[in-house]
Amino acid sequence: MNPKLGLTRNVLKRNYALITPDGYVPSVFPGWKNCTPIVLISAALGAGLSQYLISLDTNSTGTGQTEGDEWFLYVVTGKLKVNGTMLTAGGFAFLPPQTKYEIRGAAKVSSLLVFRKTYEPLAGHKTPEFFTGNERDVAETPFLGDKHARLKTLIPDSPAADMAVNIFTYDPGATLPFVETHVMEHGMLFLSGGGAYRLDADWHPVTAGDAIWIAPYCPQWFIAAGPEPARYIYYKNVNRLPR
């Protein structure tokens, strides 16, 4: 696509949005210094989550409090510290509601993905606590028995958890087994590879760096294409009775 000719792969529809790097416009976040935040998904779309992609260097800092929200942080590239804990590429951290955070860049170039939503308490269950990890330590499992489509689950599944964050890896030619149509909302970022994504009744080529918002009940399906596996990280809301 040639942006000088007014061409772009960015698409905004009622039930989904495809946000590609050629259309990124930086924002300014209170408490964040010497960094470049991009708001990929927010309530302005009608979404129930926010998704940010933040570029940092060794002079970058971000401080604040989660208040009533929960944050999931994933290091796409580089390394950084979250409340004193060093996270390298593939590292992640979960920040519960009412948590103070201090984030410091620790490499010349780092990229941080953030999923954020309002936490929904569940009677009889404690709010999940702060934790960190790295996706290299998380085992892959075949998705519905397909060894060519594999999931890594980054947030332990428990009744208290109201969000899931997973990494999906597809070998070339692998697909979702059917067109999914469900109540869960998705926010996602392609980490590597690419393919074709069906969103509602439309088809879109997708590649590393692309972000997608998928509203509840929007039909979706994906096929990986190209010489390397396709990988994306995605959010969905879970474990609560829909209204």
Regions found by a protein language model. Give the residues of each.
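Short acidic-glycine-tyrosine-enriched beta hairpin
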Residues: 82-100, 200-216
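Asparagine-centered strand-capping/turn motif at beta-strand->loop junctions
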Residues: 103-105, 222-225
